[in-house]
Design a protein with these regions (language model features):
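Bacterial N-terminal signal peptides
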Residues: 2-10
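Bacterial Sec-dependent N-terminal signal peptides
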Residues: 11-38
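N-terminal active-site segment of His-dependent metallophosphoesterases
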Residues: 28-38, 47, 92-192
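Short, ordered, surface-exposed loop/turn motifs in non-cytosolic proteins
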Residues: 37-40, 45-60
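Residue-level marker for the onset of beta-strands and adjacent loop->beta junctions
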Residues: 52, 59, 113, 235-236
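Short, acidic Ser/Thr/Gly-rich low-complexity loop/linker segments typical of extracellular
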Residues: 57-74
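Short Pro-Gly-centered beta-turn/loop motif in secreted/extracellular proteins
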Residues: 72-82
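Extended active-site neighborhood of metal-dependent phosphoesterases/phosphodiesterases
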Residues: 88-95, 100-109, 118, 189-243
Length: 243
């Protein structure tokens, strides 16, 4: 589901608990953390300056950083796998191999986890940007070719990545982003590394939405069905503000 409202972009890949916003308590607003908070941390820019008003979520609850950039959530870590920020308008996050790093995985069996995030001020005006939209690469083994349903082999995907890099290189007056609308792999979880290999040299971040063919089809639960997607691309539900 994609929702564009006055330059704001919200990405949701699959059904999950709806996020509810909670406020920081008095301790956190004074720059201290409650010892009972399961998740906590600080959001700052790349110069070490705290950033107030950034939304931070565990996928179920959402809070906002205070004046000192601090945030905390009283989460049940047995039920949560990620903590992530909503990238605010005017900021970027570091990318690793083309994948934006706005999230951190919560280690298993942790009772408390500290997650700090660094945001970088976006260069130039935030009102102009280019989004390269892709959908349904549905990569298959090189030997598979293209069948009657047009599910593509990896070499066609590699050509697409090459075209995207060349196009992005011609856009120098505004930021470039990409969004893949799902079905990156066609039910073959062994191809995730091949898919991510195509992104590693991108100079722009690629955001993703999970598709039905990106789920483990015979998984016993929804959580297990998205495990491979999450391993490579992070949480299935998140938001980004542009413009």
């Amino acid at each position: 589901i994609f929702l564009f409202i006055i330059g704001a972009l919200c990405l949701c890949g699959c059904a999950d608990d709806f996020a509810t916003k909670i406020n920081l308590d008095g301790n956190s607003s004074e720059g201290e953390f409650n010892s009972e908070a399961a998740l906590y941390g600080t959001v700052q820019d790349n110069y070490g300056k705290p950033i107030a008003g950034v939304l931070v979520s565990d996928g179920m609850q959402t809070t906002e950083t205070d004046a000192k950039g601090n945030w905390q959530l009283f989460s049940d870590l047995k039920l949560r796998r990620f903590v992530f920020v909503t990238i605010p308008a005017g900021y970027e996050v570091p990318s690793k191999n083309g994948i934006p790093q706005f999230w951190q995985r919560i280690p298993e069996n942790e009772k408390q986890f500290k997650a700090d995030f660094t945001l970088m001020k976006r260069a130039g005006s935030g009102d102009r940007y280019t989004i390269l939209m892709t959908a349904d690469p549905q990569i298959r083994a090189k030997t598979a070719g293209t069948d009657k349903y047009m599910f593509h082999s990896i070499d066609i995907y590699e050509d697409m990545c090459k075209d995207m890099k060349e196009l992005a290189a011609t856009i120098t007056d505004r930021p470039v982003y990409s969004i893949c609308l799902g079905d990156m792999v066609h039910n073959n979880m062994s191809l995730w590394e091949d898919y991510c290999e195509g992104l590693k040299d991108f100079s722009f971040p690629v955001f993703h939405v999970i598709g039905n063919h990106d789920h483990i089809q015979n998984a016993a639960s929804d959580d297990l069905a998205v495990a491979e997607y999450e391993k490579y691309l992070g949480p299935t539900n998140y938001a980004v503000d542009l413009g």
